[in-house]
Amino acid sequence: MPEAGAILPDGTVLGFDVGSRRIGVAVGTALGAGARAVAVINVHASGPDWDALDRVHKEWRPDGLVVGDPLTLDDKHQPARKRAHAFARQLRERYALPVVLIDERSSSVEAAQRFARERADGRKRRRDAEALDAMAAAVIVERWLAAPDQATLLP
């Protein structure tokens, strides 16, 4: 039996790579083919573009939300972590869904490597570079799909 508030492993999730200017969004399910990048949401001085997030939420109707937890390579906190945790709490309050945090170390590097491979194969163009944030979110979702027990339920 899953922990109360946990995301069911066969549920659809939205994943988020939280940055100071943009938030990458991806969708994934264990029953599908992993995860895919779906949106890049702008962050303004007043906070994220909640109207855009509401549209993504309405389109995908997730069972849970996975937010990248930025740690340093030596497990130390970094300033971005406070922002990611605050965003995760806002998501939980707004959508009343379970929210988990998953280690996102090197997810942007992995996303950049994927992007470079896809560009070399002719599947991506340079102007698609903004989509890198959403690709990092897809990496985060894939990590959760591969090891949901490694996630931390947002307290």
Curated annotation (Swiss-Prot):
Would you tell me the Gene Ontology cellular component terms? cytosol
Q: Which GO terms of the molecular function aspect are on file? A: nuclease activity
The subcellular localization recorded is: Cytoplasm
UniProt main location, coarse: cytoplasm
List its EC numbers: 3.1.-.-
Question: Which UniProt keywords are listed?
Answer: Cytoplasm, Hydrolase, Nuclease, Ribosome biogenesis
Protein's GO biological process: rRNA 5'-end processing
Task: Fetch the CDD domains from UniProt.
Answer: YqgF (cd16964)
Q: Which domain of life is it from?
A: Bacteria
Name the residues that span the membrane. Answer: none
What the record says about family reads:
Belongs to the YqgF nuclease family.
Q: PANTHER family of this UniProt entry?
A: POLYNUCLEOTIDYL TRANSFERASE, RIBONUCLEASE H-LIKE SUPERFAMILY PROTEIN (PTHR33317:SF4)
Function description:
Could be a nuclease involved in processing of the 5'-end of pre-16S rRNA.
The record's annotation in HAMAP family points to: Nuclease_YqgF (MF_00651)
Q: What is this protein called?
A: Putative pre-16S rRNA nuclease
